[in-house]
């Protein structure tokens, strides 16, 4: 086991896990305070994490109301190694769906997601870390 790391930046070994086509779990906060979890695709932009989603989905509405979020990524082949990224989010429109196209390539090799259509109101969630926990 490589060890444990905690800071506000993503270490190289954790970046390699994020850059791989591993699914992630996004945690947001429901209006009543309960956690809401979603399986997502993501990519890195420096130490920020980018997630494509759709305007009007529960996770998007939760983040517009309360921008705090956590993402957990672990490899299917070794779930005792993981990176947890806690922070705050911003949301920007992605009218051309550029991020979902990149993520579809990364995760499936296809040009677009199975349920993605050109008129889907896509947004990009940018998670800026306040704390990164890496156990490798």
Indicate where each model-derived feature is located.
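Short, basic/aromatic recognition patches
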Residues: 2-24
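Short secondary-structure boundary segments
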Residues: 54, 75-76, 129-130
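Short, surface-exposed beta-strand-loop junctions and turns on beta-sheet-rich folds
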Residues: 57-59, 78
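Short beta-strand segments
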Residues: 21-54, 69-73, 83-84
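Short beta->alpha linker loops
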Residues: 54-55, 95
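A generic secondary-structure signal marking the coil-to-beta-strand transition
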Residues: 14, 22, 47, 81, ...
